Amino acid sequence: MVREKVKVSTRTLQWKCVESRRDSKRLYYGRFILSPLMKGQADTIGIAMRRALLGEIEGTCITRAKSENIPHDYSNIVGIQESVHEILMNLNEIVLRSNLYGTRNALICVQGPGYITARDIILPPSVEIIDNTQHIATLTEPIDLCIGLKIERNRGYSLKMSNNFEDRSYPIDAVFMPVQNANHSIHSYGNGNEKQEILFLEIWTNGSLTPKEALHEASRNLINLFIPFLHVEEETFYLENNQHQVTLPLFPFHNRLVNLRKKKKELAFQYIFIDQLELPPRIYNCLKKSNIHTLLDLLNNSQEDLIKIEHFHIEDVKKILDILEKK
């Protein structure tokens, strides 16, 4: 474990790792500071960074297992101590590190009796196991067990969907989250208008990334999210009559509207009321207040006209078009 005294600079904004330790192969801890910050900045950065650490960093997981020995995922196999469900749960907990993109195959092929651990997984070159001792199954008899695995890199959660299992393939709930937890706290110092803040960030990871690596990746991902705002074309913004106006992108509204008119007769639009479209209540009420009662009324409005409706959002245009195209 490494500890250092906290020194606060009153000049340049700096970050520093003040504590770092490895509690086990699958649990790393890091504590970082960023200072000096103006009042309110620490909370802004802390909230954004925590969300990026927990939701924007990619991880690698086993997402599917396949074996001819397995009739269904709640069965028991003669010669194996664990149920199939328990084996799938153990595979779910295997911690992997990779730089792969897409899906890769891996394999377990073992002859009993004996213990099956993560060490027995035959991996593609781009993937490594963090803890080879992680338990998978116990073979109590001299049987052969072969399990094909699918490995993916992603972020967030991937919950297994219902499957007919006809190919003896079983999806596994995946948690693509190398950061297990992240907290931030704030220390204020100074008086009055001179008050400044220190941001403390605590990060726990599963060992596939160090806390420092996670901090760097989360920072890069946050920067990438904001980059589009730095390249907004000036000609899309203009002032008129002392009001801020924005020229909206066409969206695919115009093209999709043309396609709709080709598919359906315009006369029919006149007799289809918006009550029949099963619109969300908020969108329905906005349209009714603007005297839009039929589908023809709706389609005679441009995207810009719709956006001017009070409480109507640009996302609502897409939602309406999606509903219309299904009709």
UniProtKB/Swiss-Prot annotation:
Annotated region Alpha N-terminal domain (alpha-NTD): the residues are: 1-233
Q: Which Pfam families match?
A: RNA_pol_A_bac, RNA_pol_A_CTD, RNA_pol_L
Molecular function GO terms recorded = DNA binding; DNA-directed RNA polymerase activity; protein dimerization activity
| Family note | Belongs to the RNA polymerase alpha chain family.
Natural source organism = Nasturtium officinale (Watercress)
Q: Does the keyword Transferase apply?
A: yes
Q: What is its EC number?
A: 2.7.7.6
Which residues does the annotated region (Alpha C-terminal domain (alpha-CTD)) include? 267-327
Q: Which UniProt keywords apply?
A: Chloroplast, DNA-directed RNA polymerase, Nucleotidyltransferase, Plastid, Transcription, Transferase
UniProt-listed Gene3D superfamilies: 5' to 3' exonuclease, C-terminal subdomain, DNA-directed RNA polymerase, insert domain, RNA polymerase, RBP11-like subunit
Where is it chiefly localized?
Answer: plastid
- Quaternary state and interactors: In plastids the minimal PEP RNA polymerase catalytic core is composed of four subunits: alpha, beta, beta', and beta''. When a (nuclear-encoded) sigma factor is associated with the core the holoenzyme is formed, which can initiate transcription.
Q: Which SMART domains match?
A: RPOLD
Coiled-coil stretches: none
Can you cite a GO biological process for this protein? DNA-templated transcription
Give the protein's recorded name. DNA-directed RNA polymerase subunit alpha
Primary role:
DNA-dependent RNA polymerase catalyzes the transcription of DNA into RNA using the four ribonucleoside triphosphates as substrates.
Task: Using the UniProt record, name the top-level EC class of this enzyme in a single word.
Answer: transferase
Q: Which reaction does it catalyse?
A: RNA(n) + a ribonucleoside 5'-triphosphate = RNA(n+1) + diphosphate
- Cystine residue pairs: none
UniProt domain comment: The N-terminal domain is essential for RNAP assembly and basal transcription, whereas the C-terminal domain is involved in interaction with transcriptional regulators and with upstream promoter elements.
Q: Which GO terms describe its cellular component?
A: chloroplast; DNA-directed RNA polymerase complex; mitochondrion
Q: Which HAMAP family match?
A: RNApol_bact_RpoA
